[in-house]
Amino acid sequence: MDLMDRPHLAWHLSGGTTELLLVEPDGRNVQCTRIGGTTDISAGQLIDRTGVLLGLPFPCGKHLDQLSQNAIEKDFFQVKCPAMEFSLSGVQNKVEQYRANHSPQETAAYALRCISYAIRQATTNALKEYPGLEVVFSGGVASNSMIRHDMRMLNAIFSKPEFSTDNAMGIAVLANRLREG
């Protein structure tokens, strides 16, 4: 919990949002400033849309993650991320095109590699502007094994996957800090 007492970066990766935040202590609370993320659809939306395209059960995150484990190809679309923001709607079109000539396993991995690349680029750019800060990953998409693997070199902090599925843990931590404070 001492992380809450020093500045850090935080990703909220879910079906509803993909935001990169600068988190700064403010007494027992924190101030969060959005500094990056998607400008359109969220990572979770792209994951679910890819899963539906592949006939997976909804919500698709866990199933897409499992399906991608057997992929061999390393193809991905390099999302443009000149600063800390990026668009994923074009990736959805690329995934649909990719699916026409590739297996479900390869398509699942392709979509996840595109998402992971964009997040990694935005994080790398943020660390240039805010050097030395740790990066916390939360939200359901943060339980994805490819994203967890790809972010390991970026001062990344992940909770256990079972605590990454919703925001209940974060709300509980903040409520406890305010109660104590």
Question: Language-model segments: which ranges?
Answer:
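A short helix-loop
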Residues: 6, 11-14, 18-105, 181
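Active-site nucleophile and cofactor-binding loops and adjacent substrate-binding regions
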Residues: 11-13, 40-41, 136-139, 159-167
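A contiguous, well-structured pocket-lining segment that forms one wall/lid of small-molecule binding clefts
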Residues: 66-135, 141-158, 176-180
